UniProtKB/Swiss-Prot annotation:
Top enzyme class: hydrolase
SMART domains for the chain: AAA
Residues where Phosphoserine is found: S301, S314, S338
Residues that bear Phosphothreonine: T328, T340
Record organism: Mus musculus
Region (Disordered): 303-372
Entry protein name: GPN-loop GTPase 1
């Protein structure tokens, strides 16, 4: 009889993967909102709908279903009226006010992390409003400290056919990469108007970009040539994807690049964030220890022994004792300071009255005898 086959060991249950946060940035008019709309629809069709957050307080209509909308919390026009601000100042202030409650947004994302694989964040149209503001830094670091975070820089391909404009986009991309220090994907949008192959060639082939620049003879072209010598090493290795938010092409390749960027985050960026978090915690702990030690030294320099003042002539009283005995002490001090405390005032007055009375009687008798 054959021996029974031992049941295979159950596979270890895999821990749920945290969602990947996609931070969509780009200059005004590059098609960020349309890109988020198309990417949301693409992920819905793939059976993994994303968790969408809108951070643009000035947009009139959002063409995608937003789970969290900044307009529900902050009224953009009311902020402009109350603080007397212009459009950009209103956006910055609205974003600052929203950033003060971003811990609640993080709680919502944590609750939904087992349901959603992607978190899409659509940022304001003005790129500098989010990238170079304190609120943008707070939001980016809050996301990156808890979830795999990837920056998607949406670039208008049709406006980058000029080498100078292309270099301006690359300068923006490198500045965001330097500021966020997160995995980075350059999304060349509007490929339905013009193919993005020329831009990819300029990014990866320095000589091809120099040949295109040689056709320009302006001062700006010379500046662009100098900048390309410095920045070529940075943007030549960036991930590049060409998409069309209108037609919907290129999003499968984008999802592949997002997966690769999330793996890079877990491999390189998360250990760095953990190290920074640990060093910050150690610095705070050391600061607290120094404050406690300083407080202990300050307390040690003060005499806390109640027996230490026994030998002094004037005893030390509590504030309550001083309040209750103030009148008594003042009277005692006045009596102690008097120079006539050793004289009996009653005896002195009687001794003065007797000779005065005798003098008065003698004068009266003498006056009576004269008149007689």
């Amino acid at each position: 009889m054959a021996a029974p086959v031992a049941p295979s060991e159950p596979q270890a249950s895999r821990a749920p993967q945290p969602p990947v946060c996609l931070l969509v940035l780009g200059m005004a008019g590059s098609g960020k909102t349309t890109f988020v709309q198309r990417l949301t629809g693409h992920l819905h069709n793939k059976g993994c709908p994303p968790y969408v957050i809108n951070l643009d307080p000035a947009v009139h209509e959002v063409p995608f279903p937003a789970n969290i909308d900044i307009r529900d919390t902050v009224k953009y026009k009311e902020v402009m009226k109350q603080y007397g601000l212009g459009p950009n100042g209103g956006i910055v202030t609205s974003l600052n006010l929203f950033a003060t409650r971003f811990d609640q947004v993080m709680k919502f994302i944590e609750k939904a992390q087992n349901t959603f694989r992607y978190v899409l964040i659509d940022t304001p149209g003005q790129i500098e409003v989010f990238t170079w503001s304190a609120s943008g830094t707070i939001i980016t670091e809050a996301l990156a400290s808890s979830f795999p975070t990837v920056v998607i820089y949406v670039m208008d391909t049709s406006r980058s056919t000029n080498p100078v404009t292309f270099m301006s986009n690359m300068l923006y991309a490198c500045s965001i990469l330097y500021k966020t220090k997160l995995p980075f994907i350059v999304v060349m949008n509007k490929t339905d108007i013009i193919d993005h192959s020329f831009a990819v060639e300029w990014m990866q082939d320095f000589e091809a970009f120099q040949d295109a620049l040689n056709q320009e003879t302006t001062y700006v072209s010379n500046l662009t040539r100098s900048m390309s010598l410095v920045l070529d090493e940075f943007y030549s290795s960036l991930r590049v994807v060409g998409v069309s938010a209108v037609v919907g092409t290129g999003f499968d390749e984008l999802c592949t690049q997002v997966t690769s960027a999330a793996e890079e985050y877990e491999r390189e960026y998360r250990p760095e964030y953990e190290r920074l978090k640990k060093s910050l915690a150690n610095a705070q702990s050391n600061q607290q220890k120094e404050q406690l030690e300083r407080l202990r030294k300050d307390m040690g320099s003060v005499a806390l022994d109640p027996e230490a003042g026994k030998g002094n002539a004037s005893p030390v009283l509590d504030p309550s004792d001083l309040i209750l005995t103030r009148g008594t002490l003042d009277e005692e001090d006045e009596e102690a300071d008097s120079d006539t405390d050793d004289i009996d005032h009653r005896v002195t007055e009687e001794s003065r009255e007797e000779p005065a009375f005798q003098n008065f009687m003698e004068e009266s008798m003498a006056h009576w005898k004269r008149n007689k």
